[in-house]
Amino acid sequence: MSNLKEIKRKIKSVHNTQKTTNAMKLVSTAKLKKTEEAAKRSKIYAQKIDEILSEISFQINKIVHNEDDMRLSLFHKKEQIKTVDLIFITADKGLCGGFNIKTLKTVSEMLKEYEAKNINIRLRAIGKTGIEYFNFQKIELLEKYFHLSSSPDYEKACEVIHAAVDDFLNGNTDEVILVHNGYKNMITQELKINHLIPVEPKSIEQTHNSLLELEPEGIELLEDLMKTYFEYNMYYALIDSLAAEHSARMQAMDNATNNAKARVKQLNLAYNKARQESITTELIEIISGVESMK
């Protein structure tokens, strides 16, 4: 009888877990739809800026080679790389399966790769998971940003990327790379590595025949464009990462719910079997008692 009570207690416990994971799945699904739309809008804007940079890349190259303006150093790839800043995004919350593993593994591999080349790599961590991971590994973090990956904010995104850009312009770093696990579709996430600085606009066929002209006096306009380019790439990465996180959590909770259902089914079978055995034992005892009284 005590065995039956124990199985019944387990069934109740697993069933409650199933309710919780299913509720979390529904919440993540709702959040994903909202974040997915925001990610699409941000991506379109960032792509348009990329297109503009591609369109004027020929003019940019002319200015870069003929001007010493410090702002144009954002387009200069240094011959010798001594320091690299790595901005990476992880989740602030858990229960999202292997969402953070790809990013943390990639960052760890990049650390080893650059150290092997005697290149100093500085980490700017966004998200509690990544911060705690590297703190545990006793690896120094240049910057730590909590609550930003779970609640992307444009002004905060600007703060993060402006600090990196300023360090590049001041000669404190030679390259800035942005790493995050991004959203691909409802069931898939993909790792994205963006070499943000120095900027290398992709040339397109129409460039040389373009009617656009960018004069050295228009560097201020270029500066505004670059500012927006960096800000939106940073903000888009945060939104994209959050959409991927919700997608991963939705999957993880769906798997957990299905596993809980399967476990409840197993426990119900075990309960019925134990109950049958208990009834059979009681019947045998009754029959044996009657026989002994004859």
From Swiss-Prot:
Stated role: Produces ATP from ADP in the presence of a proton gradient across the membrane. The gamma chain is believed to be important in regulating ATPase activity and the flow of protons through the CF(0) complex.
HAMAP family according to UniProt: ATP_synth_gamma_bact
A GO-annotated cellular component: plasma membrane
Xref: NCBIfam families: ATPsyn_F1gamma
Location relative to the cell: Cell inner membrane
InterPro entries for the chain: ATP_synth_F1_ATPase_gsu (IPR035968), ATP_synth_F1_gsu (IPR000131)
Annotated organism of origin: Campylobacter jejuni subsp. doylei (strain ATCC BAA-1458 / RM4099 / 269.97)
Designated gene of the protein: atpG
Name the record gives this protein: ATP synthase gamma chain
Domain of life: Bacteria
Keyword Transport carried by entry: yes
